[in-house]
Amino acid sequence: MNIRSNPDTTLPAVTTGPLPSSRKIFSTPEAAPDLRVPLREIILTEGAGEPNLPVYDTSGPYTDPAVVIDVNAGLPRTRMAWVKERGGIEEYEGREIKPEDNGNVGASHAAAAFKAHHKPVRGVGDAPITQLEFARAGIITKEMIYVAERENIGRKQQLERAEAALKDGESFGADIPAFITPEFVRSEIARGRAIIPCNINHAELEPMIIGRNFLTKINANIGNSAVTSSVEEEVDKMVWAIRWGADTVMDLSTGRNIHTTREWILRNAPIPIGTVPIYQALEKCEGDPVKLTWELYRDTLVEQCEQGVDYFTIHAGVRLPYIHLTANRVTGIVSRGGSIMAKWCLAHHKESFLYTHFEEICDLMRKYDVSFSLGDGLRPGSIADANDRAQFAELETLGELTQIAWKKGCQVMIEGPGHVPMHKIKINMDKQLKECGEAPFYTLGPLTTDIAPGYDHITSGIGAAMIGWFGCAMLCYVTPKEHLGLPNRNDVKTGVITYKISAHASDLAKGHPAAQLRDDALSRARFDFRWEDQFNLGLDPDTAMAFHDETLPKEAHKVAHFCSMCGPKFCSMKITQDVRDYAATLNDPEAVGLPHAGTAEEGMAQMSKKFMDMGGNVYVEADSVKESNKAL
């Protein structure tokens, strides 16, 4: 386990320590030898002839036994030095925290404030601030170098293997290279096809990249509500989610202590954190959408920019003219943010202030390099409503807004549905690429059927794998509690593992050069009956081992050449190994008692001659075979 600070004063508690048979290793980019890019190395059975396998690691220092974990102090603010050495920023006092930031919570319900305080920074003047601006200027930042090294997962330049994987896949027009270089990262960001969500105030961040020419990423949602959860639970859920592979986390808190909860999460988050600012703005006006104002919303944006939120979901595509298009839907408007803005538009009979003030929002977000996640407030909430005019009208508007944000220097990704049956998924990806200039797509699922409450992690995992294959850059997880309640810790893990499967399956299908290395390693371990390696190479070693041990719990069973499904006599892999062993002895006279070692080859040659003598045809008359056999 990690070295812990004083456990009596550490609040909240989080899960630490490495995953089974794993250790933290670091890769150093040639272009920046001062950077240490984390990987997880899975240690395989000694003597098995298998090298240890490096895999992508999202867990931050929480799985590094050498690191002191103190959630009260937060993670090291390493990236601030990178930001400052580039220049073009100023440090300032920042906005004063107000009672309404935490829902005017009383002292008896107030959460403990995060003690460490850091002055925020912001961009000044016309010098590049955002990763997009640096990329367009031809400047490769440390963040770009970092993510390039990270995407290669510690591989050396195994060009032949990489090219074979690319050839085997179907990428639907993606431009995945055999190897990721910092220059390739820069060019993808400059074109708007990828983003590195990295607020300059989130100095604890380990940068990552989102784009269809990179590994498919997943997001996990956490957050309190008016009825349940606490700061402690949400920080623990964040750490738990990244332990199992969440690439980003969205804090969707809607209850008390929103500002404080977010501060605790950000200061302890090595991954990008996203939010939906309209949720907190609504809390500041007593939950009444009609009372929302542009000034209140803008103040909330400033608050969250200064804290270090990396990307905002902003439902600026929910326009007054589109609301009537949802009238005949089965499930209407299901997005919380979308319904809030729809009610505001109808109550005031005005165009959305998110749409009319969009350029001002861009100017503000640019100063902090906060990325847009343009929200799909009119997404379908049932397969009956999939691909309707309301959904696609909003998507077309998001394409217009993308162009505005790019001109302002802001990074952009686009949110997508929702509930879409399998045969209607690809058109969503194709239309998004066309309308939004290939900006990264980020979808919730989509759920492919509506008949499985309690199993929507599966209904959506199917759609997620498909749309990831078609080109979606990031998949937002769905847990078993979707439509039913707030997910707990176990639900978070189930959702993350489900979506890691979907993301990995899509990478395999696209032909990502590094994707199949882990599959092949696990397959070899399975055939060799290296049970421990099978467990440890899987996405969830604990569950795999627990399932195996339900019926074969003894340590001796972990070297047995069978499992409880087939038993020792009917194991297909054991039988195959026996056949291979037997075949290997056929040319050994001592093993099978043959008069000489060439007997097997002579027999094969005789049968080959017979085939050619009969005309070399696969199918022949039965009588001719009988006559031929008489001659033998």
Swiss-Prot record:
Signal peptide: none annotated. Substrate binds at N221, M250, Y279, H315, S335, R336, G337, D376, G377, L378, R379, E415, Y442. GO terms for cellular component: cytosol. Its cofactor is [4Fe-4S] cluster. It is an enzyme of class 4 (lyase). Keywords: 4Fe-4S, Iron, Iron-sulfur, Lyase, Metal-binding, S-adenosyl-L-methionine, Thiamine biosynthesis, Zinc. InterPro entries: ThiC, ThiC-associated_dom, ThiC/Bza_core_dom, ThiC/BzaA/B. One of its GO terms (molecular function) is zinc ion binding. It holds the Pfam family ThiC_Rad_SAM. Binds 1 [4Fe-4S] cluster per subunit. The cluster is coordinated with 3 cysteines and an exchangeable S-adenosyl-L-methionine. It catalyses: 5-amino-1-(5-phospho-beta-D-ribosyl)imidazole + S-adenosyl-L-methionine = 4-amino-2-methyl-5-(phosphooxymethyl)pyrimidine + CO + 5'-deoxyadenosine + formate + L-methionine + 3 H(+). Its EC number is 4.1.99.17. Residues 1-13 have a biased composition (Polar residues). Catalyzes the synthesis of the hydroxymethylpyrimidine phosphate (HMP-P) moiety of thiamine from aminoimidazole ribotide (AIR) in a radical S-adenosyl-L-methionine (SAM)-dependent reaction. Homodimer. Belongs to the ThiC family. This is Phosphomethylpyrimidine synthase.
